[in-house]
Amino acid sequence: MEKLNEGLDPSTPFHFAQDDTLMLDYLIPFLTRTFAFDANSPLLFTQFYFWGFFAVVFAFLTLIKNRIALRNAFLFATSLFFYYKTSGSYVCILIFCVIANFFIGKWIERAELQWKKKFLMIIVVIIDLLVLCYYKYSYFFLDALYDFTGIELHVYNFFAAASNKMFGTHSLVDTIILPVGISFFTFQAMSYCIDIYRGKIKAVDNILDFGFYLSFFPQLVAGPIVRADKFVPQLYKHFFLPRRTFGIAVFWILNGLAKKIILSDYLATNFVDRVFDTPLLFTGLENLIALFAYSLQVYADFSGYTDIAIGVALLMGFRLPQNFNSPYKALSPTEFWRRWHISLSSWWRDYLYIPLGGNRNATLGTYFWMGFLSLVAIMLSGSVWVGIALGLFFLYIAIYAYLKPDSRKFITTNMNAMSTQIVGGWWHGASWNFIIWGGLNGFGQVFNKIWVKRSRNFRAAASFILFASSAIIFKQTHIAIFAITAAYFGILFTGIYSVLIFRLFSDKYIHGIYVAWNVSLTFIFITFTRLFFRAGSNLDPAEANEVAWNTAKNMVQQMGTAWKWDTIGTIAWEHINIILVFVAGMLIHWIPKKIKSRYRIAFASQPIPLMVASSAFIIFVIYQFMSADSCPFIYFQF
């Protein structure tokens, strides 16, 4: 130190100490902020902090890229840190799921007797479902108990109580908060153990490798749900990032950010949220615009998250499955669900719909689920009359199937499809709105199967009758829902008659007209079902049922009755920015797949300097649309 101070002011030695102190003054708060959980600032793809976090992860990953065991352990630890920054102490639940599913999965594989394998598989599925149901459906079951017996019990958060005692936290014990992404990683864990039981995959040998599979941070909190047979083999491959793959990854990230910020967040903060919060303050047209805008918002939000997740994973050398395939190009509700949230839809197909009998027959599981869902409906309604109505409906179905044996396969197939859709609705939340949303999607699929088998003349006549009867009922009762159904069936029969008339003159463009028409009808139907989906979202579980139902009812009322025809032009002009963003988003969505593939490859094939410049420009444009408070991704709540 003396040599260092030669020729310097006598105060110099203290200068070094002061610098060290100042450095610590900055470093300690920085580390505290970095490693502390802040519920108001979760780690999101839309935050600059996330990209700083990912830059560190990516840099370290390139240093250990060929040391597979270390890489997997590092990414597992990184994923746990990511989840901790998103959900705090709930990371312990994720760790519990990793431990439980890893060891029981190993036991399933080692069991020699089939009944032991099945018993262990059932045990692990029950464990995963109990974890999910405790956090997601506690309010629902306690409310149902009170409605039917008058016994009033309150939720108690055992995990929060244990956390307070062990770690000195101050979490509320009388409130249960849904951990982010719990529905996704529990489903992923269940599919892993079920696939081991079915002999489809081998159990993972190393718990760190399995933990990495179950918690991989890009897709942890909102999917896509990754199957072990597709992802686990990637755990043991060396890291390799070709130049074009790097370009494709950057493209997906920028594409996802543009969807989320320019489309989804802009529509939500500037119009959609305001209308859904207070629908009675807006006209029927404004409610309708908000509903259609929400259809684009939820797609841009969810597929935007998936695009970013795919891009981030690709930069680290891992491929995630496609989760969306231009769903608003679907020609029917059934096709829509093949294109929307593909990883969840295929999960329902493989682990619920097909085991129930699929399109072959009914099984004991079919009747169990129909009975269980009927019980759920009775609990939600709090009325025995709902149970009587459902009982009479199932009695009618049973008598019809008995009298017409040829129809049994059709009935059971559609019962399985309906059960799957309603369970899917209930997976999103325990309120009437999600049950109705799932039921409407199931009804749409069943109705479409019946409808397309009928002749054009029959469809023309039936659509006119449905339109006329809905219009007459609305005229007599002023019940808003009949105005909406009259409008839908009016559009339907207008289209059918237009096609019939057009065929009299030319068949040249009939296929294109048919495709455009069915895409439009499907989009309108799916958009209407979203009314019940959005109304039930982002609510306190303790009051979700009442608030969601009132929101949906008020919006239906406004859309069915609150129209001022002389002000339509003025109202539309007031919201021209929203309409233009919606139209632009839909036009981009409807661009043919081949063209999208070409400009994706063109971006990835650019020289690096040009790619950097174009990426910087895109980021600058995206930044102009960012609001002060970024909206959380919609599917975080599930």
Positions of the model-derived regions?
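Aromatic (phenylalanine/tyrosine) cluster motif
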Residues: 14-16
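Short, low-complexity intrinsically disordered segments enriched in A/P/G/S/L with frequent Arg
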Residues: 10-12
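A cross-taxon signal for low-complexity, glycine/charged-rich
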Residues: 1-8, 18, 373-378
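Membrane-embedded transmembrane alpha-helical bundles that form the catalytic cores
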Residues: 22-637
